[in-house]
Amino acid sequence: RITLDAVDGGREIPFDVATDLILHRNRSLPFHPNGMTFTAWSGQDVVVERTFYSIGGGFVVEHGEDEHPAIVRDSAPAPYPFKTGKELLQQCSDYRMSIPEVAMANETTVREQEEVRGQLLDIWAVMHACVERGCSRCGVLPGGLHVRRRAMKMHRDLVTRERIAPGKPEPFGSVDWLTVWALAVNEENAAGGRIVTAPTNGAAGIIPSCLHFAVKFLSPGSDIDSGTPGVDTGDDELIVDFLLAAGAIGEIYQQSASISGAEVGCQGEVGVACS
């Protein structure tokens, strides 16, 4: 039994996980499948009741009187707003800007550009660390299915192939790298490791895999025979632009459709990540 501390002069609330946390496995709240209602009781009387939804991508919204609560956004209006891909491309055309430039301009209405860049590079660092862990760990993943990790062996085999034939990439070798990096992240997610929700946990392997691909195979200073690229690539601009563009596309889906696997299924969240 635990007690939730009083906040802002409120009361302490006794809370017993065994009896007070109730899971309704065959029921769903009206707005979204991932929902939770908090109810505080005083005897038989309800003192306060509030409902929250986890709608994917790290967004949490509260259910109020409005039947469809909206995500609370920053108060500063974006200078280049868009809700669809067509509107985004129109902004780029009208102002002769790239997608990353439009995204950065919108971000800098609420924070400095260097802060945005720093946060994006921090995201890359977490993605990279996740890939490295996934490519270096073996064994069986948690759960009753007893699934064995595969990314480490696949990664080791790819590195060996590069060493045997340096400078001579196989026709589909780059696809193999995409596969192993995505698998490494998915295995880390299954093991409870630290990942970046991009756009969701279930589809979190695709964006890091594509970004690693860009750094390894598309960066002007990259070495295609160097295995998995290091975290300090010397090409911060590519990384920042990649994540800004990915964020802009994800924003379109978040506003006009959904990025939540609970709402649109596994293929929906994976489809968003692949876009």
Pin down the residues of each PLM region.
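C-terminal regulatory domains involved in ligand/effector binding and gene-expression control
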Residues: 2-166, 177
